[in-house]
Amino acid sequence: FILGCGVAGLAAIGTSKALGSVVRAWDVRDVADQVHSMGAKWVSVDFKEDGAGEGGYARESSDAFKKAQQETFRKACEEVDIVITTAAIPGKRSPLLITKEAVKCMKAGSVIVDLAAVGGGNCELTKKDEVYTTENGVTIIGYTDLSARMANQASAMY
């Protein structure tokens, strides 16, 4: 399940599909066509609100939308093995997308990779610059320097 379909999110979709995964994705902006074109299923929140801001970036959502969004994501988290979050709002804290209740609903052995940890994280339980496993067996990765940790591999791929 990919949350945030900007550059990093679309790359995560492409890599996940290449590895044979069934991919679901969401973004506050209307990018369903891009998500479908990459072979992923679009997850929609049953609430109408335009989340596009200036320059094609996301803007902050209303409280009512956030509530509907978090319930949609909680239900999705029950069914997936990995959640990759990439949602950010320039100059602001990363939006909270995955609540602790959603993490409690996930299967043991599931993983959350919070690429928005540098801005506080999209997951309520993310610990900045840490990896840990919750009581129910979900591993949460909150590194803020993930690309630097993979420098040798990234250089070899280049």
Annotated model-derived regions:
Residues 107-110, 138:
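A short helix->loop->beta-strand "cap" motif at the edges of active sites that frequently abuts
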Residues 87, 115-116:
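Glycine-rich, N-terminal phosphate-binding loop of Rossmann-like dinucleotide-binding domains
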Residues 103-107, 133-134:
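Short, conserved loop/helix-junction motifs that constitute active-site signature segments
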Residues 1-76:
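Glycine-rich phosphate/diphosphate-binding loop of Rossmann-like nucleotide-binding domains
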Residues 52-83, 87-100, 104, 143:
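A structured beta-alpha segment of the ubiquitous adenosine-cofactor-binding alpha/beta core
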Residues 123-158:
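Adenosine-phosphate binding glycine-rich loop
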